[in-house]
Amino acid sequence: MYADGVPKSMEGGRSENDVSLWSFCRFRDCVECCVCGNRNGAEERKENKMKVLMINGSPNENGCTNTALEIIGKTLAEEQVDSEIFQIGRNCVKGCIGCGACSKEHRCIFDGGVVNEILDKMENSDGLIIGSPVYFASPSGTLVSALDRIFMAGDKFYLKPAAAIATARRAGMTPTVDVVNRYFACVGMPTVPGNYYNMIFGRTPQELLQDEEGVQTMRTLGRNMAWMLKCIEAGKNAGIDAPAAEKKIKMTFIRQA
């Protein structure tokens, strides 16, 4: 090792950028890291891969929304980030009844459905992407019912990067994305951009793939998500702690006389 701790295998042609990348690596104790071409610690790196949960709010398993999420998933894989598509599908999802029981256990009292399953998956996920087709200029009703309960009960969302995408034949995607983004804002999740609004057009998966700009936006979103996850991980390894969440202050705008 060098005096500054950089592996000797980096001498002779290794750029300053390689050394910089190595300095943030969480596997520095393997001495010969992936930056310098060695595969020591590869199994450990594989086990510690970052993961993004992608929720498909469409009732159609292989429709346009799934196709858009698959484009993102392929890009994430190219960036060494795992992903999983969870389809809410045609399940009957109850809406939130506002009982408040989830505040204690951070699980929905209506067990046995997709809501608690998603909450369990979020515990082991580093990022979240939610996709929906447009239903009357809003997300699908099933998705909204699920999200109301998920974000009311969940406590594993704070500072995890998130993004919303929408698919449509023609219009209504802007308010659809806006509805989903508001869930992220309420629990302190930073939102990840593409290179334009996270929307893609098509009535069928085949038509969707013809929207070259939309496809590019999905790819860019995948790369940006991977980059943000890596930046957060690099910050942790550099000793930069995430800001602690303050205890929530809840007020009403109605003042008693």
For the regions a language model picked out, list residue spans one by one.
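N-terminal beta1-alpha1 ligand-phosphate binding loop
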Residues: 51-79
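Cysteine-cluster motifs in flexible loop/terminal segments that predominantly coordinate metals
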Residues: 25, 30-33, 91-122, 250-255
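Helix-loop-strand module that forms the ligand-binding subsite of alpha/beta enzymes
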Residues: 105-196
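Short, Lys/Arg-enriched N-terminal segments with co-localized hydrophobic residues
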Residues: 37-49
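Acidic/polar hotspots within intrinsically disordered regions
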Residues: 2-4, 15-18, 40
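A short beta-strand-loop structural module common to alpha/beta enzyme folds
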Residues: 82-91
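Glycine-rich phosphate/pyrophosphate-binding loop and the adjoining helix
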Residues: 111, 190-257
